[in-house]
Swiss-Prot record:
Keywords: Amino-acid biosynthesis, Aromatic amino acid biosynthesis, Cytoplasm, Transferase. PROSITE patterns: EPSP_SYNTHASE_1 (PS00104), EPSP_SYNTHASE_2 (PS00885). It catalyses: 3-phosphoshikimate + phosphoenolpyruvate = 5-O-(1-carboxyvinyl)-3-phosphoshikimate + phosphate. This is 3-phosphoshikimate 1-carboxyvinyltransferase. It comes from Buchnera aphidicola subsp. Schizaphis graminum (strain Sg). GO terms for cellular component: cytoplasm.
Length: 428
């Protein structure tokens, strides 16, 4: 395994990037396809560690699927119902939250005996709000080690009914409930306690459910009504749009050191909230052009930003890097859920930004970033977090080199990231 990657100073950014499929959409649509009536042909599926964990789990559950085109096309043979296993199994899901949470819910419908576990970091990521909600709906679940964290044993039994869910930590808990509630015996009312984070990710879920023939009643994200005893119907073919979070690095590179960059696979018609990253770049001064399925960013003088970024939590990490190249102190707010991602991203970003010379103030749910007077060469710890590696690659646009430790962590979502980044990089 490669210990580090040193990126030399890049003098200019220019080119076109064809985005891999969205991770958020890929794992959702794989699960929906497995539970739907009929065969679904998925194209532009993301080929990454996280999708492999989902596919491996579906195979172990008994779902038939066939991969082609370098694992980006997948024919999924749906079973037309929730999963019911005749024998106990264990599923290892690494650090893939988009597999762990929805699969736990899906396996909590019929009577089952399944243990879901992951790597060390997954066992530090809270899951109590989802477990509590499933128990309210009649499911039987047990923590196998620490209370509130995976691994978790589910024995099934979720029937629906009235459920109170804390929405303040992760939208994936709500996504998981929404996706399985139509298959429950009873109607389900989900009432949200607290402020729901990352609402655009819920919009992705609702959009996908609609594509598979299921609609729900959304009362301003305060409550959700889902009719029970429904069935998902395969749409036949489904094209996974490009990953908007992955687009952020290339758009940011153009804003900092363009030239221009065109990202193909997301645009005005995208269902992902992270496309609003381009709006933030525009507010900072970058020049943005939109198409139905592409975004173009051109360099311009960048100014500080002071924004609530709860709606783009993953792409907001890239804004923290862009802020290093802007005039003035930028403040990124309402990002507490960074702390329960692949690593504690607030703490990690704070430490690594200081290494390159930035003045950082870290709050419970915010980050203040003052650009360096001059950039310093640094070895960047990635904390086995793919987004840390991709974000800090942009430091090479500062006129100095940067060394990224454990660069292979990008395989979680974007194995070819560095290859693509170098394609649009120009060197003196």
């Amino acid at each position: 395994m490669q210990k580090f990657l040193e990126l030399k100073p890049v003098s200019y950014i220019n080119g076109t990037i064809y985005l891999p499929g969205s991770k958020s959409i890929s794992n959702r649509v794989l699960l929906l396809s497995a539970m739907a009536n009929g065969i679904t042909c998925l194209t532009n599926l993301l080929d990454s560690q996280d999708t492999q964990y989902m596919l491996n789990a579906l195979r172990k559950i008994g779902i038939k699927f066939f991969l082609s085109n370098n694992n980006t096309t997948c024919h999924v043979h749906g079973i037309g119902k929730a999963f019911h296993l005749s024998h106990p199994i264990s599923l290892f899901l690494g650090n893939a939250g988009t597999a762990m949470r929805p699969l736990l819910a899906a396996l909590s419908l019929y009577e089952n005996n399944v243990v879901l576990s992951g790597d060390d970091r997954m066992h530090e990521r809270p899951i109590a709000h989802l477990v509590d909600a499933l128990k309210q709906g009649g499911a039987t679940l047990e923590y196998k080690k620490g209370i509130g964290y995976p691994p978790v044993l589910t024995k099934g039994g979720f029937k629906g009914g009235s459920i109170m869910l804390d929405g303040s930590i992760s939208s994936q808990f709500l996504t998981s409930l929404l996706m399985v509630a139509p298959l429950a015996l009873q109607n389900t009312n989900i009432f949200i306690k607290g402020n729901l984070v990352s609402k655009p990710y819920i919009d992705i879920t609702l959009n996908l459910m609609k594509s598979f023939g299921v609609n729900i009643v959304n009362d301003c994200y305060k409550s959700f009504y889902i009719k029970g005893n429904q069935k998902y119907e395969s749409p036949g073919n489904y094209l996974v749009e490009g990953d908007a979070s992955s687009a952020s690095y290339f758009l940011a590179a153009a804003a900092i050191k363009g030239g221009s960059v065109k990202v193909v696979g997301v645009g005005k018609k995208s269902v992902q909230g992270d496309i609003k990253f381009a709006d933030v770049l525009e507010k900072m001064g970058a020049i943005i052009d939109w198409g139905d399925s592409f975004i173009v960013c051109r360099h311009n003088k960048l100014e500080k930003i002071d924004l609530d970024m709860n709606h783009i939590p993953d792409a907001a990490m890239t804004i923290a890097i862009v802020a290093l190249f802007a005039k003035g102190t930028s403040i990124i707010k309402n990002i507490y859920n960074w702390r329960v991602k692949e690593t504690d991203r607030l703490s990690a970003m704070s430490k690594e930004l200081k290494k390159v010379g930035a003045i950082i103030k870290e709050g419970r749910d915010c980050l203040s970033i003052t650009p360096p007077n001059f950039f310093k060469f640094a070895e960047i710890d990635t904390y086995n977090d793919h987004r840390m590696a991709m974000c800090f690659s942009l430091i090479c646009l500062s006129g100095i080199s940067v060394r990224i430790l454990n660069p292979n962590c990008i395989s979680k979502t974007f194995p070819s990231y560095f290859e693509n980044f170098l394609k649009i990089s120009r060197f003196d």
